[in-house]
Amino acid sequence: MKKNFFCLLLAWVCAITSLSALDISRLPRQISSGPQGKHHVQGIAYDEKNDCIYMSFTTTLIKVDLQGRVLGSVQGLTGHLGCMALNPDDGRLYASLEYKHDGIGKGIGTQANDKANGFYVAIFDVDRITRPNMDAAEVMTTVYIREAATDYEAKVTNQGKEVDHRHGCSGIDGLAIAPKWGKKGGRQMLYTAYGVYGDNNRTDNDYQVILCYDISKWKKYEQPLSSQNLHQSGPEKPNRKYFVRTGNTTYGIQNLAYDKHSGHMLAAVYPGKKAEWPNYNLFVIDGTQKPKKSNLHGFDHPTKGWTLSLLPQGEHDAKTNTWGFRFPYGSTGICSLGNGYFYVSHPGKDAQTGQQCTTLYLYKWNGNEWHLVE
């Protein structure tokens, strides 16, 4: 009797695994967005349940099927909508959203924004995105990221001089949903990465900074967002604040993607400009290594933080002991599909209209190299 029970259980598990396995044959090798206006693509996400793709174009979110046909869109965001990820626990789409008045943030959109700076995670009810040109108030709530705002507004001392923005923080951009660091299952956490200003003269901006939040009880913070009156409803602190030493990059992690297949986190960046660093385009953060409480380099005063390790794959710069990849894509969108497959954004401009667009290409990553899937 017990033997029969276990045989049936094994058959059931195998059937479920087979149903959930990635069917690569049905995935298009390319998905084109079509022309989307003056702002370039910032992030992408694949919705396995609804079999569709989401793309952010700075002030617009579009929802397309796998043939690129628009199923719905959210218009009129006057902030900077960036990297995004789908939360498998609640089926909603989470994205970074910035309102600030620096060279990038000032003047996005056509409406006058609140004079304050604000950094948020935008949360979209994707099942309600059913038609083009929807207003964000119909489908989106937001949670304030106080830690990023505090670091953005802070003044610190570096090399004896007062400088703006702790850690070089320019806000938030990269975002991923993944289990607690080092685990492959369990409750989903939200990870959002700082944008980091590209200042070659500072020594305290050579880390990527990643905030980790338990989002299971975020409902109490969620509010609609008025760009003329930015709210500050959000957690006081992150559950953890992680540091990854990569060398300074231009505006920090642009896209962050969790690869469930390997357990690693991929961080796509615009390369930095410090001559003493290798300035890679892509870093892989090792999900098998536990965080370590370490002394942080480059600070005027002794500073400790939870540090994460880079995966020892790709190219290695012996001088700085930095691992990374010279993969030119991913900074405008990368999402894991499973089994080592990814959709990766190749941004461009439409030849006829001159408007911004992107084509998502299907890639296979073997841990060392990226290959287009034919």
Model-derived features: where do they sit?
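Beta-strand-rich domains and repeat architectures in extracellular enzymes and scaffolds
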Residues: 29-59, 173, 179-180
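Repeated scaffold domains used in trafficking and secretory/extracellular systems
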Residues: 38-45, 78-87, 145-155, 167-178, ...
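Residue-level detector of Asp-centered blade-edge/turn motifs that repeat once per structural unit
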Residues: 46-49, 86-90, 179-186, 260-262, ...
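Blade-loop segments of beta-propeller domains
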Residues: 67-111
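Beta-propeller blade signature
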Residues: 108-131, 203-222, 226, 278-301, ...
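Beta-propeller domains
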Residues: 23, 46-77, 235, 290-299
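Surface-exposed loop and turn segments in beta-propeller and other repeat-based domains
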Residues: 27-34, 127-172, 215-250, 293-328
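Residue-level signature of beta-propeller blades and closely related beta-rich strand-turn architectures
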Residues: 59, 98-101, 127, 149, ...
